[in-house]
A protein has these predicted regions:
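Glycine-rich, flexible loop/turn motifs
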Residues: 25-33, 40-42, 50-53, 82, ...
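Amphipathic alpha-helical transducer elements in NTP-driven molecular machines
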Residues: 34, 48-51, 64-70, 84-97, ...
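Conserved Switch II/interswitch segment of TRAFAC-class P-loop GTPases
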Residues: 42-47, 74-84, 95-159, 172-185, ...
Length: 367
C-alpha cells in the first residue's frame, strides 16, 4: 500500500538529517532555513524479525521487506498559512500525506541557528500547530459558505449533515484545537476526511534530543515537555537523535548492533518511528512465502482476503477463489508446511475472511 508520513517542523530542527537517516540518502541538510526547497520522498524498509525467521526456513532466492514512505517537507515558519516563508505550497504537500511526523528540537547547540534564537519545544509545537489550524480554518470556512444556504433553505439531508460536521470542526479550530479533537461518529469522520484537513491527520511528535540524552531521553527536560503535550493530545511521541540515527544508517548491520549496545539501547529510534507510524495508520503485515521469494506485504487492518490479494496483483482480487492461510508463529513452531498440514494448521479461507497480522497466504484465483 502506498502510504506516507510527512516530516514537518520549524527550520533547523533536524528534519533533513532525520530523513537522510531514514532513507540512507543524502538530500541537502544545510544550516540555514529552507535548505529543503522541494519535498524529498524516500522509501524505507520496515525491519521485521519475522521476515528473517521465514528466510531461515525457506531459503528463498529473493527477499522483499515491507516498505513505508517518508516525505521531507520544508521548514514551516510563523505565518506560513498566510504565505510567509515558503508558504502554502508546503501546506499543500502535507495534505498529500497520511500522517504527520512533527520533529521538535530538544537539544542545545550554539552552532545550529534556531529560527527564534532559543530552544522552546512548547512554543515551537504551538507555532506549527497554529499554522496547520489556520490553514484548515480557511478550508472549512470556504466549504461552509458553499453549503450553509442549501442547509438552511432546502433542508437537504446531506447538506444539513455536512453543515453540522463543518460547524463542529470550525468551533474547535476557532478555539485553536485540531480537527482530530472533535468527537465524530463513523459517517461524520468519513465526511470530515474528504476535506483533507491537516489537523485531522494522526500525529507523531518526534523529539530530536542530543547525543547525551539518546540512551535516556526521559532525563531531558525538553523531551518531557513534548511527551506531556503528546499525552494530552492522545498523540504518539518518539525520542530520537537525528545525528546518531544518520550515523547508524551508514554502518553495516553488525557494527550497527555493536554501536547500539555501546549506547545502551536495543533498537534504533528510526525503527521505533517506522513501527509507530504503522500502528498510527492501523497497518499490519501479511506474508507470501516459498523457495522463490519471501515477501512482506502491508495492509490496512480490516481488509478482506480478496482485498489483500489485490495488493499483490489486481487479477488476484478479481479472480479470487480462496486463500490457504497459516500464521507465521505456527510455521516457526512446526518448521515446514508439510508438518503444518499434518497438524491441521493450514486453513482454507474464503472471500469474507479478514486477514490478520502475521498471516502467511497462498492465493488461489482464476481469471
Amino acid at each position: 500500500m502506498a502510504l506516507q508520513a510527512g516530516i514537518v517542523g520549524l527550520p533547523n530542527v533536524g528534519k533533513s538529517t532525520l530523513f537522510n537517516a531514514i532513507t540512507s540518502s543524502h538530500v541537502e541538510a544545510a544550516n540555514y532555513p529552507f535548505a529543503t526547497i522541494n519535498p524529498n520522498s524516500g522509501i524505507v524498509e520496515v525491519n521485521d524479525e519475522r521476515v528473517d525467521k521465514l528466510v531461515s526456513l525457506f531459503h528463498p532466492k529473493k527477499t522483499v521487506k515491507a516498505t513505508f514512505e517518508f516525505t521531507d517537507i520544508a521548514g514551516l515558519v510563523k505565518g506560513a498559512s498566510k504565505g510567509e516563508g515558503l508558504g502554502n505550497q508546503f501546506l499543500g504537500n502535507i495534505r498529500q500525506c497520511d500522517a504527520i511526523c512533527h520533529v521538535v528540537r530538544c537539544f542545545e547547540n550554539s552552532e545550529i541557528i534556531h529560527v527564534d534564537n532559543t530552544v522552546d519545544p512548547r512554543r515551537d509545537i504551538e507555532t506549527i500547530n497554529l499554522e496547520l489550524i489556520f490553514a484548515d480554518l480557511e478550508t472549512v470556512v470556504k466549504r461552509i459558505s458553499k453549503v450553509e444556504t442549501k442547509a438552511h433553505t432546502t433542508k437537504e439531508k446531506e447538506a444539513v449533515k455536512e453543515f453540522n460536521v463543518l460547524s463542529k470542526i470550525k468551533k474547535a479550530l476557532d478555539n485553536e484545537l485540531p480537527a482530530r479533537s472533535v468527537e465524530l461518529d463513523e459517517d461524520e469522520l468519513l465526511l470530515a476526511k474528504s476535506y483533507n484537513l491537516l489537523t485531522l491527520k494522526p500525529v507523531i511528535y518526534v523529539a530530536n534530543v542530543s547525543e547525551e540524552d539518546y540512551a535516556s531521553p526521559s532525563s531531558c527536560s525538553y523531551y518531557q515537555i513534548v511527551k506531556e503535550i503528546a499525552d494530552r493530545e492522545h498523540a504518539e511521541c518518539v525520542p530520537i537523535c537525528a545525528n546518531i540515527e544518520e550515523e547508524l544508517s551508514s554502518l553495516p548491520e553488525q557494527e550497527k548492533l555493536e554501536y547500539l549496545e555501546s549506547l545502551g539501547v536495543s533498537s534504533t529510534g528510526l525503527d521505533r518511528l517506522v513501527h509507530t507510524s504503522y500502528r498510527l495508520l492501523n497497518l499490519s503485515t501479511f506474508f507470501t512465502v516459498g523457495e522463490d521469494e519471501v515477501r512482506a506485504w502491508t495492509f490496512k487492518n480490516g481488509m478482506s482476503a480478496p482485498q489483500c490479494a489485490g495488493t499483490i496483483h489486481t487479477d488476484f482480487e478479481k479472480g479470487f477463489i480462496r486463500a490457504e492461510v497459516y500464521s507465521c508463529s505456527d510455521i516457526f513452531e512446526y518448521k515446514t508446511e508439510k508438518a503444518l498440514r499434518e497438524a491441521g494448521k493450514i486453513r482454507s479461507e474464503g472471500k469474507t475472511y479478514l486477514v490478520k497480522d502475521g498471516d502467511c497466504m497462498l492465493i488461489r484465483f482464476n481469471v
